[in-house]
């Protein structure tokens, strides 16, 4: 549908909302996530959650009537980070999974199609800014089928693939499949995606850019290095008097030693004489190898 009554990228006006899933514990990223929720871990000096919200804003999806964020693990930090930018759904008894998180928001979704994004997905397309880079997911959607953003899988027959593609963080769900999701633990793969695939009602929309699932320290480092490009990415408020090579240095950090292919979190310190290589250094002094 297009024309003056159309919403983002051709979707019916008022017919699309978005949910960012930010409730997970990030167990594979521990110990980085022992004090900071995975959704707030910075990539390229920007929290992953803020990257997701910026991508939605690039599609014209903003504000608490249109965008929701769920929270559970260290949820108070997520709530503070979101502020008034989105509707908040706090899961007090632990994360409800991807399906349960959406199911808990049924009254808020209220008949709309819903664009569901994983806060921990890092996406970057040099040909398009955040938002327009995933606009094909919404373009000419029929409002009834399921769409997944994906990229070709190295092994198209591997478990977990959809039509030979690996899921890359965003899906589009019709209300008819959302309205019956219970607010109990469950995942979208089994509750929605596979049944829709079996019914011939699932389509994969290829994503042409880079995707990194930041689930492990190695992948988290890879996402940061991609965000930095061929050089280092240093926040203007950081102090770097040592060496900095292909690294990301956050706000208020101090680097007097030498860092190579590493991430220095906001407020962290690398003392003179220290040499960091392929690690993440946090503000508490924790050093996590990315190998």
In which residue ranges do the predicted regions lie?
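Active-site regions of enzymes building and remodeling cell-envelope glycoconjugates
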Residues: 84-89, 157-164, 262
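A generic "binding-loop/recognition-motif" signal
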Residues: 25, 36, 74, 210, ...
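Conserved catalytic-core motifs of eukaryotic protein kinase domains, centered on the activation segment
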Residues: 31-34
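Extended beta-solenoid/beta-helix repeat architectures
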Residues: 222, 226-291
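Catalytic-core segments of class I nucleotidyltransferases/pyrophosphorylases
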Residues: 113-117, 122-147, 152-228
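Gly/Ser/Thr-rich beta-alpha loop segments that engage phosphate groups in nucleotides
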Residues: 25-28, 99, 171, 217
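Conserved N-terminal catalytic core of the sugar/cofactor nucleotidyltransferase
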Residues: 2-21, 28, 42-127, 281-291
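Conserved beta-strand segments of alpha/beta enzyme cores
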Residues: 39, 85-87, 201-203
């Amino acid at each position: 549908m297009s024309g003056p009554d159309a919403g983002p990228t051709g979707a019916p006006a008022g017919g699309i909302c978005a949910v960012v899933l930010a409730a997970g514990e990030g167990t594979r990223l521990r110990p980085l996530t022992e004090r900071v929720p995975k959704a707030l871990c910075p990539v390229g000096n920007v929290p992953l959650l803020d990257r997701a919200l910026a991508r939605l804003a690039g599609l014209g999806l903003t504000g608490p009537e249109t965008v929701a964020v769920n929270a559970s693990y260290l949820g108070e930090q997520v709530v503070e980070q979101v502020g008034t930018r989105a509707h908040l759904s706090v899961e007090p008894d632990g994360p409800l999974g991807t399906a349960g998180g959406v199911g808990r928001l049924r009254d808020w979704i209220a008949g709309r199609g819903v664009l569901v994004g994983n806060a921990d997905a890092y996406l970057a397309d040099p040909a398009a800014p955040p938002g327009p880079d995933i606009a094909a997911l919404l373009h000419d959607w029929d409002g009834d089928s399921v769409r997944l953003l994906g990229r070709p899988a190295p092994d198209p027959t591997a478990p977990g693939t959809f039509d030979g593609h690996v899921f890359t963080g965003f899906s589009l769900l019709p209300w008819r499949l959302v309205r019956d999701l219970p607010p109990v633990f469950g995942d979208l793969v089994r509750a929605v995606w596979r049944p829709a695939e079996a019914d011939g009602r699932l389509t994969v929309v290829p994503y042409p850019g880079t995707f990194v699932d930041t689930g492990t320290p190695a992948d988290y480092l890879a996402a940061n290095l991609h965000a930095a490009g061929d050089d280092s990415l240093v926040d203007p408020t950081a102090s770097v008097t040592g060496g900095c090579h292909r690294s990301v240095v956050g706000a208020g950090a101090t680097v007097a030693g030498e860092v190579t292919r590493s991430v220095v979190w906001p407020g962290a310190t690398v003392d003179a004489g220290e040499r960091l290589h392929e690690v993440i250094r946090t503000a508490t002094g924790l050093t996590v190898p990315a190998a």
